[in-house]
C-alpha cells in the first residue's frame, strides 16, 4: 500500500500562486511546496507598461522565480502542465514528470481572449507577458524606422497609426503609454511627432464601462487628450477582422476600415484551457466557465483543491480580476493550507478593495482611494508605482521602508468610514512628504538595474 503524499502543488506563478508559496514559507508550513510555471520569470503585470516603455528594468518587473523563492524552501519547477487529474490527485507535465499532491492550488490566471474575431490571434499584438512586450516594442521601432524612409504618404500614415482594441483598464493604459513615448521615439529619429496617430477602439458607449476603474473615467478621458499626441476614442465600435495592414470594425451598423500596421489587442480574456478541462459540472461553473469556489476558495467537489486569482469565481461574491485581489487571496489560501496541516478550522477569505490605480501615460496616473478620493497626475503615478514596488519581495527591495509610506498609510490600513475624510487629508500630506523618499528608492532601483544588465 502506497504511503500518503503530504505535499502541496501550486500550478501557476502569477500573483495568487507566487504569494501563496511565499506566505506558506513565511508561516513555516510543515509540508513541502512545489510551484510549477512554464516561464522562468514572474511577470509583474501591472508594471509591464513601465517595462515596455523603458521606465523600469526587467529585474524589477520580470524577476526570476529562483530569485524570488531563494531561501524559502519552495521548490520551483519550470515546466508546462499537460493535464490535471483531480480524482488521482496528480499533475502531469509535458516533460513526462508528474507530481502527486495532498493539496493543490490552481492559480493559472486567464489567457488572451480573441472572441473569434477573424485574424485577431494572428495579426493583433497581445500584451500579457514579457515576450509580448518585447515583440510589440520591436515591431513599433521597425514601423518607425520604415516610416522615416517612406516616400509614400499613405504608407507612412499606416506605419504611424496604432489601434488599441478594448477600452477597459488595459486598453486605456496601453493607449496612454503609446501616445506618450511613440512621438518621443519618432522625434529622435528625425520624424514629425504630430504624424503619430493612436486610436482607442471601444465596444461600449464609454471607456472603462463596468470596470473597477469606472470612477476614474472622467479623469482618464481628460488625460487621454493631454498626451504627447491626443488619443482618438471611437466608441460603440466592434472589431470584426484584424488584417496585416488594417482593422475592420462595425460602427453604427456600418463596416469601417482603418489602415494600420499595428493593432494591439486588450479586448478581454478567456478561461485557461486547463481550467476548462477540469471534471467540474456546468452547474458548478460561472458564465465564463470558471469553477465556483467556496468562501474558503475550495472547489465544491474537490475540497483539497484551492483556486485563486482570475481563474476562480467565488460564490455570491464577485471580485475584479486585479493584482490586489489575487495577492490577498494568496495570503488567505496559505493560511488555510496551514490550518489543514495543523487540523484547525478554515476561515473564509476576506478581500478588501483598497483603491484602484490607473496608468495614464509616462509619469502620469490616476488613483481612486477607498472610492471616496481621487488623485491624478504625477502624485498618482508615485502612489501607483510605490504601491506596486512594495509588493515585490526580492532581495534588492531591502529599502522597502523607504516606500512603505505609500503601502501602509494609503492602502493597507482598514479605515473606519467616519475617519475616511481625515485619513485622506493625512494621505495627501504623506504623499507630499514621501515623494523625495520614493524618488530616492527609484534611483536606487535604477542603479541596481544598471548593475544587473551585465548578467
How should each PLM-predicted stretch be described?
Residues 2-75, 162-163, 169-211, 435-455:
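Beta1-alpha1 glycine-rich phosphate/pyrophosphate-binding loop at the start
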Residues 122-152, 245-246, 257-328:
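FAD-site-proximal beta/loop scaffold in flavoenzymes
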Residues 28, 329-439, 443-448:
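C-terminal, flexible cofactor-proximal segment of oxidoreductases
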Residues 16, 109-112, 175, 269-271:
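Short glycine-rich anion-binding loops that position phosphate/pyrophosphate groups of nucleotides
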